């Protein structure tokens, strides 16, 4: 199972680097920061499906 450490999040702003991750909601997040912010917003219900686009 792929995991991402989101312990340093949320962050107020994310960089624009493009390293896509696919969330358990079947949405592609552009990078770890945007994914981790969404994980925090979901109260931990969002998980990583896999690295790369959904």
Curated annotation (Swiss-Prot):
<dbReference type="InterPro" id="IPR051597">
    <property type="entry name" value="Bifunctional_prot_inhibitor"/>
</dbReference>
<keyword id="KW-0646">Protease inhibitor</keyword>
<keyword id="KW-1015">Disulfide bond</keyword>
<dbReference type="GO" id="GO:0005576">
    <property type="term" value="C:extracellular region"/>
</dbReference>
<feature type="disulfide bond">
    <location>
        <begin position="14"/>
        <end position="33"/>
    </location>
</feature>
<dbReference type="InterPro" id="IPR036058">
    <property type="entry name" value="Kazal_dom_sf"/>
</dbReference>
<feature type="site" description="Reactive bond 3">
    <location>
        <begin position="16"/>
        <end position="17"/>
    </location>
</feature>
<keyword id="KW-0325">Glycoprotein</keyword>
<dbReference type="GO" id="GO:0004867">
    <property type="term" value="F:serine-type endopeptidase inhibitor activity"/>
</dbReference>
<protein>
    <recommendedName>
        <fullName>Ovomucoid</fullName>
    </recommendedName>
</protein>
<feature type="disulfide bond">
    <location>
        <begin position="6"/>
        <end position="36"/>
    </location>
</feature>
<keyword id="KW-0722">Serine protease inhibitor</keyword>
<feature type="domain" description="Kazal-like">
    <location>
        <begin position="4"/>
        <end position="54"/>
    </location>
</feature>
<keyword id="KW-0964">Secreted</keyword>
<keyword id="KW-0677">Repeat</keyword>
<feature type="disulfide bond">
    <location>
        <begin position="22"/>
        <end position="54"/>
    </location>
</feature>
<dbReference type="Pfam" id="PF00050">
    <property type="entry name" value="Kazal_1"/>
</dbReference>
<dbReference type="InterPro" id="IPR002350">
    <property type="entry name" value="Kazal_dom"/>
</dbReference>
<dbReference type="InterPro" id="IPR001239">
    <property type="entry name" value="Prot_inh_Kazal-m"/>
</dbReference>
<feature type="glycosylation site" description="N-linked (GlcNAc...) asparagine">
    <location>
        <position position="43"/>
    </location>
</feature>
């Amino acid at each position: 199972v792929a995991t991402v450490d989101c312990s340093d999040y949320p962050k107020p702003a994310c960089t624009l680097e493009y390293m896509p991750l696919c969330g358990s909601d079947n949405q592609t997040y552009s990078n770890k920061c945007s994914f981790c912010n969404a994980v925090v917003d979901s109260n931990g219900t969002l998980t990583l499906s896999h690295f790369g686009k959904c």
